[in-house]
């Protein structure tokens, strides 16, 4: 952040969150253009073509402001959807660049304020907490003691004006917010000319950064109220709530919330007194698990629906929240089927001349790979058919043999690495079989041969070295305990370096 601060010269404007001048700086869009900045190598690099020009982006912003003051709310007609004489290039490209530039500008005051709020506080800064797998040890420890879970589909049909209004108490620069509001309005109108069937929240990978930022920030608003109510109802304060930044908007919401619910406030706090309640949000979904009864979970469901509709203007329905009993239902969670199953065990008790067999059942958190959705993902990616039979990948036939093998091997290693937490490894073996045979069929198609003849000529060892399984990697990591490592591999392994989900593992 120091580098950002020096480069963007934020000292003069950060006190009042005056970010309007940054919108006109070309280096902002150069930073947005560079997708390699602070991104994982596992993410797909979607670059722009060489026809993009920062000067045209700056001209487009100036043109936007001119139209804004003239109150002309239709910058482009339907005939100008792809080419525009003013721009001379693809208009969609520059709208995407401006969206990413806005995302960089809007994130700056939040990052600075978060950093300043954490100074002097003893908060552990661990990169391991960013890992997706870091949530599963928590679930292993907590879910085995719980009974019910709410599977919540978070409402996403939020008007863009509400998202901009949420920023007003954070960024007090009215000019930048007015320009952002105007641009989002124009972008939605222009985007509907090209994709009229898409909703305002159906965005491609190139331009979703700003909208995801606004959406996540809006969701964090009501989550912060949950933390506030939880702390008010419990003598044990939540440590994580200290990371929420103090802001006027939050406390105004709290005051309004308490004022409306003056009579029912104590009853509402009763919801949060349950010491065995846990909340997790992920991928537009959230789960709320509790040790309570089904009646309590029903009350939670209707409370959440009314809370979203009345105080955050988000339309929702009770049907979007499902109540599941953990012992009878599996939870589709981050590429895993998670459930709580009973693990029976027998204990022999000896008392003098008599012995007794005592049956005992222990609840255990279990995670497996959903093989049917996984085969569906492989089928959509053209690695196999809908029945799971491997097929060739014709679009890769023009690559070199080493590139083809490396691509297939990398996909399998990523999937095997991500699903290392599965308690049953047989599903991974089937995925390996599909990818290996698909790779062999692709190579045979390229050389106009059969799979049998190709493997007989080059040997199956050619593919084996590229499809190094997680077990071999684990053995290489702990070479002195190879026999022990094989036993450990059969158990669940959670890695703390996974910050994204492979598209094939994401069945959402």
Swiss-Prot record:
Alphabetical keyword list: Chloroplast, mRNA processing, Plastid, RNA-binding, tRNA processing
Gene Ontology biological-process annotations: mRNA processing; RNA splicing; tRNA processing
Highest rank taxon of the organism: Eukaryota
Main location: plastid
Disulphide-bonded residues: none
UniProt GO molecular function: RNA binding
Known function: Usually encoded in the trnK tRNA gene intron. Probably assists in splicing its own and other chloroplast group II introns.
Protein's UniProt name: Maturase K
């Amino acid at each position: 952040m120091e580098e950002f601060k020096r480069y963007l010269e934020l000292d003069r404007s950060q006190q009042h969150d005056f970010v309007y001048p940054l919108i006109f700086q070309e280096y902002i869009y150069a930073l947005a253009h560079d997708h390699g900045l602070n991104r994982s190598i596992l993410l797909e690099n979607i670059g722009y073509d060489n026809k993009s020009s920062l000067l045209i982006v700056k001209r487009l912003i100036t043109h936007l402001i001119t139209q804004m003051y003239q109150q002309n709310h239709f910058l482009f007609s339907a005939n100008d959807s792809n080419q525009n004489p003013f721009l001379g290039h693809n208009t969609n490209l520059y709208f995407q660049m401006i969206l990413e530039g806005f995302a960089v500008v809007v994130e700056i005051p939040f990052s600075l304020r978060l950093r300043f709020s954490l100074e002097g506080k003893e908060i552990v800064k661990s990169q391991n907490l960013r890992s997706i797998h870091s949530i599963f040890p928590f679930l292993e420890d907590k879910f085995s003691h719980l009974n019910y879970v709410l599977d919540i589909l978070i409402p996403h049909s939020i008007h863009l004006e509400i998202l901009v209004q949420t920023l007003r108490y954070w960024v007090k620069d009215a000019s930048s917010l007015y320009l952002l509001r105007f641009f989002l309005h124009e972008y939605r109108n222009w985007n509907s000319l090209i994709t009229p069937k898409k909703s305002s929240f159906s965005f491609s990978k190139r331009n979703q950064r700003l909208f995801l930022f606004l959406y996540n920030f809006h969701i964090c608003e009501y989550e912060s109220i949950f933390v506030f109510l939880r702390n008010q109802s419990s003598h044990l304060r939540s440590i994580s709530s200290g990371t929420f930044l103090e802001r006027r908007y939050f406390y105004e919401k709290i005051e309004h919330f308490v004022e409306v619910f003056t009579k029912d406030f104590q009853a509402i706090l009763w919801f949060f007194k349950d010491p065995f309640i846990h909340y997790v949000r992920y991928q537009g979904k959230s789960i709320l698990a509790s040790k309570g009864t089904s009646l309590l979970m029903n009350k939670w469901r209707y409370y959440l629906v009314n809370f979203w509709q009345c105080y955050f203007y988000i339309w929702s329905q009770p049907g979007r929240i499902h109540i599941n009993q953990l012992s009878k239902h599996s939870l589709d969670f981050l590429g895993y089927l998670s459930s709580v199953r009973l693990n029976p065990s027998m204990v022999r008790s000896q008392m003098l001349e008599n012995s007794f067999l005592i049956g005992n059942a222990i609840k255990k958190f279990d995670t497996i790979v959903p093989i049917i959705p996984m085969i569906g993902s492989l089928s959509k990616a053209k690695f196999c058919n809908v029945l799971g039979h491997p097929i060739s990948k014709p679009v890769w036939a023009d690559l070199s043999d080493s590139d083809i093998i490396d691509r297939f091997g990398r996909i399998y290693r990523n999937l095997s690495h991500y699903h290392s937490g599965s308690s049953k490894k047989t599903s991974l073996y089937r995925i390996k079989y599909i990818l290996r045979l698909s790779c062999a069929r692709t190579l045979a198609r390229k050389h106009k041969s059969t799979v049998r003849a190709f493997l007989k000529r080059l040997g199956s060892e050619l593919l084996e070295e590229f499809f190094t399984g997680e077990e071999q990697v684990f053995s290489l990591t702990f070479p002195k305990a190879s026999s022990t490592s094989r036993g450990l591999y059969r158990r669940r392994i959670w890695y703390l370096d996974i910050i994204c989900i492979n598209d094939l593992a994401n069945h959402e």
